[in-house]
Amino acid sequence: KLTQVLYHRYKAGKKGIIMLACELIDNNGKELLKCVNQYIDQWGLDDGFRKYVNEDCTFCGSLVDRIVPGRIRDPKEVAELEQKHGYADPLLDVGEVFGVWVIEGDTKLNDVLPFRKAGLESRVFVTPDMSPYKKRKVRILNGAHTGFVLGAYLAGFDIVRDCMHNDTVRGFMNKMLHEEIIPTLPLDKK
């Protein structure tokens, strides 16, 4: 569908657009561009369109980490949400609010994307290289979850939120983070 949308924009003489790839795979922006180019080949689309895609459009990689555990199974909670919002959603899901979204691209994107205007400059970052952010995310977030999950599960906890409300589990995780995980990162100590 994306290739079709871009092709229609190209044929209509519209300027290129910015794509923010959010798939949780390495090099997601480059992989998305690769997919579009593969469709250009498969469908025999013209070289002018290929040039438009590769030069006028921007394919940014990004790092978004958001835990989406799945459907809400408690009928009472579903009913409360349906009442609150005024409609029934058969695909109702729950997800944690993510704290940071890192977009890999030219920092000039800050002038085009509306994140600053929305007051999100402390939560959305545009950077030419997101690899340091990925390393931090993988080690800190995934390391913390991996490090405390077994003990938390044995203590009877099923979700991260409940673990963080428990002083013992939260204390263990914080100690592990500060003594074992964060020292392995090339971070500014501030």
What are these regions (language model features)?
Residues 1-190:
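Substrate/ligand-engaging "lid" and interaction regions
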